């Protein structure tokens, strides 16, 4: 694993909140620059969760290979550390074949862990701990977890910027898993911040209302594409499909399946949950260093992104 952190292969990332057109831009850049896509979406790794995760369709791929998609059954677990290892293997293979690895997705923890080379504790974490921490981050926000870190490991907290959520989670994971402070480890054991030469393109809209309209429209289209049936499958298997059962796009319909709500309020709840999630995504990516932000609605978006990518590759 240590060798992978010494690589300086070029990696492109297309990030941002949901419904900003990341997939289409990633595919366009892959076509132009000979790239392949590595999905950085925590739910698209699962088979059968297609509509609710806005998984890329065969038509939308334009023949570009997409990796880290449809690899696991919904009852299997997949952690941030698992993704980092998988993405590292994929990057090595793609670079060896002369392909540009293009990371596309909105799971900020995945993107930041891979690009910035954050290692998680080598000791096996208790089952579900990483998922629990990720859920706490989404529910409570980064400030609350940073405050917890200050209480249990003030030395580590002092050395970590509050906005570096990946390292905050890593430190908390280490403490909860081992009962020991991360600050007790030698600094030499920590990996360098950025293992790859990366260009990170972020997509957003100038007006928040425009993003929200796009999200609402996407939910309506998901309903037309069969989201309700997919959510019913998750509901029927909710004990086994623990991760999916907590995911936005499925849990909002459980009251309907239990006869506790009409369908329309569930759809509206999903739209609101998606808007809230988009705000959290924006907060995460706005705190990431080096993101080049682009107007997702700009007529010259693809041309602008292509120019930046060409400059990035040429400078290599």
Residue ranges and their predicted role:
Residues 1-316:
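Phosphate/pyrophosphate-binding catalytic cores of soluble transferases and nucleic-acid-acting enzymes
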């Amino acid at each position: 694993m240590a060798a992978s952190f010494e690589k300086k292969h070029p990696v492109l990332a297309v990030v941002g909140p949901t419904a900003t057109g990341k997939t289409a831009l990633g595919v366009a850049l892959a076509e132009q620059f000979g790239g392949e896509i590595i999905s950085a979406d925590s739910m698209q790794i699962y088979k059968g969760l297609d509509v609710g995760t806005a998984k890329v369709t065969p038509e939308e791929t334009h023949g570009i290979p997409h990796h880290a998609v449809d690899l696991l059954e919904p009852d299997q677990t997949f952690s941030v550390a698992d993704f980092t290892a998988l993405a590292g293997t994929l990057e090595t293979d793609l670079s060896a074949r002369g392909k540009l690895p293009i990371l596309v997705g909105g799971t900020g923890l995945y993107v930041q862990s891979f690009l910035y080379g954050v290692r998680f504790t080598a000791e096996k974490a208790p089952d579900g701990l990483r998922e629990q921490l990720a859920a706490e981050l989404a529910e409570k926000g980064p400030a609350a977890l940073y405050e917890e870190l200050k209480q249990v490991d003030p030395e580590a907290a002092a050395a970590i910027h509050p906005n570096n959520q990946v390292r905050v989670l890593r430190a908390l994971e280490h403490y909860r898993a081992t009962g020991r402070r991360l600050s007790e480890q030698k600094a030499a054991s920590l990996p360098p911040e950025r293992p790859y030469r990366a260009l990170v393109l972020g997509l957003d809209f100038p007006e928040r209302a425009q993003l929200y309209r796009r999200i609402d429209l996407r939910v309506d289209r998901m309903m037309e594409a069969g989201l309700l049936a997919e959510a019913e499958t998750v509901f029927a298997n909710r004990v086994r499909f623990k991760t999916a059962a907590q995911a936005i796009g499925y849990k909002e319909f459980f009251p309907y399946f239990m006869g506790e709500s009409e369908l329309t309020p569930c759809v509206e709840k999903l739209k609101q949950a998606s808007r809230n999630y988009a705000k959290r995504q924006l907060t995460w990516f706005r705190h990431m260093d080096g993101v080049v932000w682009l107007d997702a609605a700009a007529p010259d978006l693809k041309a602008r992104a292509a120019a930046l990518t060409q400059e990035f590759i040429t400078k290599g």
